[in-house]
Amino acid sequence: MAVDLESLLQRYVMFLLHQKGLSGETYRAYHNDMNHLMSFLRERGGEEISKETVRSYMLKLHTTYSRATINRKLSAIKGFFDFIIRQGALEANPFSHVRSLKNPGSLPRFLTPDEVFDLIDATKNSRDRAILELLYSTGIRVGEVEAMNCYDVDMTAGFVLVTGKGKKQRRVPVGRRAQAAIRMYLRERGIDDPIYSRDPLFLNSRGKRITTRSIRWIVSKWSTQAALSRQVSPHVIRHSFATHMLDSGADLRSIQEMLGHASLSTTQRYTHLTVDKLMDVYDKAHPRAKEE
């Protein structure tokens, strides 16, 4: 298979970014996945991909990564070789016979409401508090926070405009506490009404748009400061938002819309958490639930 994979990879990542409209976070993940494969091929002395090469690479993945990460990498690789076929440089996808791994059905980790409150109360500056309040108030993704501009926040209507995967936009309600935290932070920057500002919503210490890496670091830093018993990430806060909403009676369709899930089945993971809670309450409270 004498094809210039490196050159085709550059064309593929540009295709993902400009034509497929992948979010920055997903684009970077796919790009890193393909670079991982390229590095593996270079270590083997070239870019020729045989069945043995595919088997060796998949074995390497199985000994290093989780099922979810392996499936994501496999999806990126299959998409890349399908792209090469469409370009006329290959006749068959060398990874087409490799099946995705079944998800064991692990439930998302989440914080209790008290843990979330402790996390937010531990913050010592207005920007970080506004970020944490926004994450928990809306359940949006870390990459969506990074991409937000000031004019995406409508204080009057109580909504934020979120640009999600595939450049799809949705309006998500934002609570009063999050609004107040954002307003305080923006006023420190001299912005009274965000709807009239085209600046990034959150800035780093150099006055540039904050990155997803920085947001993750902020969440981790304050979770340590709050002495929480588990490591916290923006995604854990997102799971906490969904779980708390469902526990409080919100319907699945509304949660799906707020989270930006394309499929309701993705949102339905949270129903398992609520069922577990209901069973626990039932076992403790119902007179006929206890064993004699």
Please report, for each region that a protein language model flagged, where it lies by residue.
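Conserved catalytic core of the tyrosine transesterase superfamily
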Residues: M1-E292
